[in-house]
Amino acid sequence: MDDQNRRTRREFLTHAAGAAAAIASLGEAVLASQTPAGATGLPMRVLGRTGERVSILCLGGWHIGSVKDPTEAIGIMHAAIDEGLTFFDNCWDYHDGGAEEIMGRALADGHRNKVFLMTKNCERDYQGSMRCLDDSLRRLRTDRIDLWQFHEIIYDNDPDW
C-alpha cells in the first residue's frame, strides 16, 4: 500500500465505527420490517420460501426431553405457546422418541393448531423414512408435520447429495 492510501489508526477506527453504526441501524430497520410482532410481542418471520410465519425463536425437543418431570415439560411448552412461540422442533432420535411423546401430549387439546411443527428423519431409504414418519406422527399425536427434514447427513453411508 502506498503512503497516499495509508490511513492512521484513528482514521481507520473512526471509519470502522461509523460503518458499524450504519450497518447496525440498517439491520434494525430490516429486522423490524421483516419481523412484525405477533399478538404477544414475539417477533415473527416468514420461514424461507414456505410463506409460513413462525416465531423467531424455536422450542427444541432435545431440551424438552431433558426435563425430568413430564408435567413441567408440558407446562413449559404451554407457557411458550401462550407467549407467542409458534415454532417447535423435534426428532425421533431425541431421548429415544421420548421428546416427541411428551411434545405430543403438550400439543393435544387444540395446542397443535397453534404451532408450526418440525421433526426430523434419520433414515436413508424410502421404507425406513416412511416408518420413521409414521412413528413420529403417532408419538406427536398429529396427522401432519409442517416441516420434515433429514437429520445429520454426516455418516459414511449417507447418499451423496
Where in the sequence are the language-model features?
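Glycine-rich, proline-tolerant flexible connector loops at the mouths of alpha/beta enzymes
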Residues: 90-106
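Acidic (Asp/Glu)-rich catalytic clusters
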Residues: 48-51, 104-112, 136-142
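Short, well-ordered coil/turn segments that N-cap beta-strands
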Residues: 52-56, 85-86, 111-115, 142-146
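Glycine/proline-rich, positively charged
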Residues: 124-161
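C-terminal segment of N-terminal export signals and the immediately downstream linker at the start
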Residues: 27-57
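N-terminal secretory signal peptides and thylakoid transit peptides that target proteins
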Residues: 2-20
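Conserved, mostly hydrophobic/aromatic
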Residues: 47, 59, 88, 103, ...
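Active-site mouth loops of central-metabolism enzymes
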Residues: 60-70, 119-127
